Amino acid sequence: MENVKNFVKLFVEYLQIEKNYSQYTIVNYVDSIEEFETFLRVQGINGFEEAAYQDTRIFLTEAYEKGLSRRTISKKISALRSFYKFLMREKLIEENPFQLVHLPKQEKRIPKFLYQKELEELFEVSDISQPAGMRDQALLELLYATGMRVSECCSITINDVDLFMDTVLVHGKGKKQRYIPFGSYAREALKVYMNSGRQCLLMKAKEPHDLLFVNQRGGPLTARGIRHILSGLVQKASSTLHIHPHMLRHTFATHLLNEGADLRSVQELLGHSNLSSTQIYTHVSKEMLRNTYMSHHPRAFKKN
């Protein structure tokens, strides 16, 4: 048991220091590792070093039987493969049981995005007379204006925001940084929040910090906190609207491409290493498809 804890602790330090992964990613990795460790104990296997390839097959079979998606299972495999690769590198174990495990073939899913009308509903519900409402409005505007990941948003500091140049410095995956511009709506919302709302919320903080977005107690706003805020805004805006934080990123990319932005520029803004990751956003909305069809097909309208 002591070995198990030490292995996980060393791996977490590696992810933090060498890989510079976000806390959100690290938590997901640890969850997968702990789930596998629990599985091994149930099987009567005393440690990670005793796991064999056939054990990984049983573990993944159970995951499929639970109804987990291929995407979720792929994430678990990637986390455990990285964990064992690290243990091998450190010479803590002799074999990697996940080395021969293949990732399941992914279903091609079109990312869900918001239509302009749905967005406008969200932008109208924050109570900007209150500090929390100022924060919520700034958060919503910035996420849509930049398309940054929620984990990236949580790490933005006040010094990363340039209200004169209308840009924000984003700290992405693998220690990569990029500047993203934002428009006048985001600028005004940020200005109000930074000059007033944030100061009020910080008065409750136990210790000072320079992170841009803060919670009701003045502490750093987490990814879970952002999900909670967006859920609250959705409930106020519409009972039929379903949204998760990443959907604003999908919407950002979709709207840019629908309005004629080139794929390479969108790739840079999103912080994707590979163009293939951005190409999933080349789908177009049903409205745009219909408008294109009605405007260009010779027999779209019956002539009188």
UniProtKB/Swiss-Prot annotation:
The active site is at residues 149, 173, 246, 249, 272, 281. GO terms for cellular component: cytoplasm. GO terms for biological process: cell division; chromosome segregation; DNA recombination; DNA transposition. GO terms for molecular function: DNA binding; site-specific recombinase activity; tyrosine-based site-specific recombinase activity. Residues 2-88 form the Core-binding (CB) domain. Keywords: Cell cycle, Cell division, Chromosome partition, Cytoplasm, DNA integration, DNA recombination, DNA-binding. It is found in: Cytoplasm. Residues 109-294 form the Tyr recombinase domain. InterPro entries: CB, DNA_brk_join_enz, Integrase-like_cat_sf, Integrase_catalytic, Integrase_recombinase_N, Integrase_SAM-like_N, Recomb_XerC, Tyrosine_recombinase_XerC/XerD. Site-specific tyrosine recombinase, which acts by catalyzing the cutting and rejoining of the recombining DNA molecules. The XerC-XerD complex is essential to convert dimers of the bacterial chromosome into monomers to permit their segregation at cell division. It also contributes to the segregational stability of plasmids. Forms a cyclic heterotetrameric complex composed of two molecules of XerC and two molecules of XerD. Belongs to the 'phage' integrase family. XerC subfamily. This is Tyrosine recombinase XerC. It comes from Bacillus subtilis (strain 168).
